[in-house]
Amino acid sequence: MPRLSLAAAVALATLPAQAAEVSLNFAHFMPAASWQQEELFLAWERAVEDRSGGAIDVTVYPAQTLGKAAQGYANARDGIADIAWTVQGYTAGRFPLSQIVELPGLFDSAEVGSCAFQKLYDSGALDAEYEDTHVLWVHTHGPGHLHTRETAVTTLEDLEGLRIRRPTAVIGTLLEELGAEPVGMPAPGIYEAAARGTIDGFMLPWEAVAGFRADEVADHHTQFGFYALAFVATMNKRTYEALSPEQKAAIDAESGMAWALEAGRGYDRGDVAGRERTLASGTLHEIDGAERAEWEAAAARATERYLAELDAQGLPGTETYEAVEGHVAECREELGR
């Protein structure tokens, strides 16, 4: 039997061990036919698999198949899902500083909002809110508008007493200031609630109106830009820590700003297409002039109220809001927006 030379033996001994393949599941609540499934989540799946050289296998589960939307963050934290994409505000009170990006008037595109939110996260200002998971990226959608079943809303008086679905408690505060009655529910519940008349309307960006077929249950669409929603794609901490160094490097390389921007740009494209689809069958109402000033004053009161609540709890609400404003300015300059 031939003997190995000393050099060959040393070379074999020092070769890195081939990392074993790891299978990860990725849960989200958007429909299987949504643009997010193909352009964001499956694209991320392919990127990670390619980056890892096949050492990581990702399977994406859409449409709440691994858990309800409201449990998304908890499912990632507890290992029910290895990775989950969810809305921070679905876990009320858990992400008070992150939800500052939801406040009205901070930005007018998902790309800029996502850039600013990721910068805020990267600064370490939000570390305490995510200490029990491993965050991949954060982002926002574009401006959210008001969509109503039968009532044309063009004044604050029109909105008085209407039962309006709010995505989060922060946006509920805004609706209260506007005179509406906020009703909490995740986005997948909107279609049925509106069809049954349980709610009179709902808050959604144009992109999501089309994505959840909500244009089928609302005839009137009031464009104002009330809010933006905060999202996070995050990973079970134990699952991440169990990866090999090479596998961690692959995950890390497909995390952060690049994917925040990818998500934001996708939402901006979705808003253009969603608005076109929605207005093909619905009526657009825009808030202008003196009436707009009244709505903006109500939005400003909601912002002041939320930040005051955080400051009173000893949280840096006002400081974080000002940081977001600074990041928005940076992102607009960097992105040419």
Regions of interest found by a model, annotated:
Residues 10:
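Expand to "…catalyze enediolate/carbanion chemistry for C-C bond making/breaking, isomerization
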Residues 1-6:
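Bacterial N-terminal signal peptides that target proteins for export
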Residues 20-112, 121, 128-337:
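N-terminal secretory/targeting leader peptides
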Residues 14-19:
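N-terminal signal peptide c-region/cleavage motif recognized by signal peptidases
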